[in-house]
Amino acid sequence: MEYKDPMHELLSSLEQIVFKDETQKITLTHRTTSCTEIEQLRKGTGLKIDDFARVLGVSVAMVKEWESRRVKPSSAELKLMRLIQANPALSKQLME
């Protein structure tokens, strides 16, 4: 059986607590930026929320969650949004 130093275990647990809080702060900051970007992107394309959802292959409710900052889109969804932003004609092709 492996001996575990109690002091080492305590310090390790404290580090996990401290770094967990830092990770959440970073995630929340990124999350806010992404969601604001999503709302701006959708409005910039001129698409209604239901058309934007259809282009991305998600529900209208999901787009509303992103825009209200309750849910973060996946990296694949973010990439598709950026492609649409770079090439607005792509959204029309995806709707066909």
Swiss-Prot record:
Positions of the HTH cro/C1-type domain: 38-91
Entry keyword annotation includes Transcription regulation: yes
Transmembrane parts of this sequence: none
One MF annotation (Gene Ontology) recorded for this entry: DNA binding
InterPro entries per UniProt: Cro/C1-type_HTH, HTH-type_reg/antitoxin, Lambda_DNA-bd_dom_sf
The entry's DNA-binding region: 49-68
Alphabetized UniProt keyword annotations: DNA-binding, Transcription, Transcription regulation
PROSITE patterns for this protein: HTH_CROC1
SUPFAM superfamilies: lambda repressor-like DNA-binding domains
SMART domains: HTH_XRE
The protein's name: Uncharacterized HTH-type transcriptional regulator YiaG
Organism name: Escherichia coli (strain K12)
